[in-house]
């Protein structure tokens, strides 16, 4: 048998297999691989980026779904509404474009894309939350500059379920600054609503709101 590495450590293995083909030739195959043994499991977070826009009449479905998920799972559901409208951040939209086929859309942990309705989000959340988490990230302190500055200083630490120094892997932090309840005087801030007057059934209160 193969001995597993110590908990939290990694080990390299070389496996060689020899067999004889139909022409009686001896064939030797060698595989080199590494194995990590996870030492402990950290609490997993589910990050959902929602592609949305005020021009999108079906996007209230995503607004309702994201709100419901945050209320139900406040500690491990991280929802980020990524707007492609007057509130657009070009760099962010460009970053998620490879995942987007249409709006509204939910991108789950940058691996799965799906409709952001409440039942669909909940179903995918249940699949994601049981996956093992190999690291824990903690923000100790965040300092924002003055109103004219774009600088943010963040003190962050992380722990790994394996020896990250020996693993020779390239890990990076990604931070997202969000702003809630953004309002403006332009009509471009008004949400288009195809669920007005009950069209499409109940939608978290949007069925009672105007169409724009």
Question: Could you tell me what each predicted segment is?
Answer:
Residues 19-26:
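Short, solvent-exposed loop/turn segments at the edges of extracellular beta-sandwich modules
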Residues 6-10, 41, 147-149:
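Surface-exposed coil/turn segments at beta-strand junctions on protein surfaces, enriched
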Residues 26-44, 196, 200:
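Short beta-strand elements
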Residues 38-77:
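Local sequence-structure signature of Cys/Sec-based thiol-disulfide redox active-site neighborhoods
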Residues 75-212:
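Short, conserved sequence motifs used for protein processing/export or organelle targeting and
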Residues 2-9, 163:
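Short, surface-exposed loop/turn segments at beta-strand-coil junctions that are enriched for proline
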Residues 9-15, 152, 171:
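Exposed beta-strand face motif in extracellular beta-rich ectodomains
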